[in-house]
Amino acid sequence: MESRVLSRTTAIAALPKLFRPSREAASFGFATGVKTPVGLVKDGGSLTWGRQLRPVLLLEPVQTGPVCSRREKTAVQPCRAASGSSGEAKTGFLEKYPALVTGSFFFMWYFLNVIFNILNKKIYNYFPYPYFVSVIHLFVGVVYCLASWSVGLPKRAPMDSKLLKLLIPVAVCHAIGHVTSNVSFAAVAVSFTHTIKALEPFFNAAASQFVLGQSIPITLWLSLAPVVIGVSMASLTELSFNWLGFISAMISNVSFTYRSLYSKKAMTDMDSTNIYAYISIIALFVCLPPAIIVEGPQLMKHGFNDAIAKVGLTKFISDLFWVGMFYHLYNQLATNTLERVAPLTHAVGNVLKRVFVIGFSIIAFGNKISTQTAIGTSIAIAGVALYSLIKAKMEEEKRQMKST
């Protein structure tokens, strides 16, 4: 009898002990802060209170707060991994292919620029007032920015005195480059202006080395030589050549070079969309006084009346509005592209854009060009292509050295 009692006692002692959790833990499945004897877990584990009869091993040690059991943890992990992989599939495409995004920026930049240049030159054919048209370009862009800010697309970034000091020289360079470019567009053929402005990589390289102190390899300098030679050949035999158009295009090269360099510095504090919006506002105030002084009297006397008499009031206003919209949008995309690439790469892309503009402008306006001008333009474009290949190869070598 005694042995039978002892055997029952031993059998009962060998069974796993049951722990009734608190009501809060039982209802939500959360572990409490009560310490569980490690020996009980080792012997067979604790049983979750209720209908579940199989032992569930608790984590060792048990933490306070919501902690899942090992059984629950192993059951949840695959779902969590699947969810994560699904999220990566949805959001990781653009991150996996950044070159595709940058390429789309370049394409839209080129497309809008071609439309702008064709419409802009058509306006100058019946309304030759580049200072006033430059103001209209910026004014339409500023109205667009204010309307976008009012609906939160994008959200307006606050302006402080430090950033304002950075943006003022950028806006001044932008205003000077914009006005001088339009003076050149009004004076000579669009194709010739863009041929002169193909020298922008040369000015960017010079500014990067002598202003920013960056070392430019001799091979890059040599690759820019065909660009200079080609532009010189094209200039000597350009049928629409005049010094006003040539000098204005050269001044715009210098101005836009400094704009690119200082814009890159300013982007550390604000996104490119808001930066260009503030630049447009400041540049508008910079361009307005010269337009009033230089062209104001002529516009009031006969400029507006002549344009309305030639094309009508509706078309005149419509042309000014759309040329301003295309100008703002293509410059906004150019600024967004600059945010993704280095200034020199941006300059090269700018020159390749001119290939499209030159080609489409010749087709649209039927401009006659001499054989030497065509050869010079081709040499300049080939020089830019050579420069791009050398620059890309150097950047790839730098990335490989950093990875090793």
From Swiss-Prot:
Subcellular location per the Swiss-Prot or TrEMBL entry: Plastid, Chloroplast membrane
InterPro entries on file: Sugar_P_trans_dom, Tpt_PEP_transl, TPT_transporter
PTM characteristics: The N-terminus is blocked.
Bilayer topology annotation: Multi-pass membrane protein
Domain of life of the organism encoding this protein: Eukaryota
Residues in compartment: Chloroplast intermembrane: 75-98, 153-209, 295-372
BP term (GO), one: transmembrane transport
Entries under Pfam families matching the protein: TPT
Chief location: plastid
Transmembrane segment boundaries: 99-119, 132-152, 210-230, 275-294, 373-393
Keywords: Chloroplast, Membrane, Plastid, Transit peptide, Transmembrane, Transmembrane helix, Transport
PANTHER family the UniProt entry points to: SOLUTE CARRIER FAMILY 35
Family statement drawn from the similarity comment of this UniProt entry: Belongs to the TPT transporter family. TPT (TC 2.A.7.9) subfamily.
The protein, known as: Triose phosphate/phosphate translocator, chloroplastic
Species this chain originates from: Spinacia oleracea (Spinach)
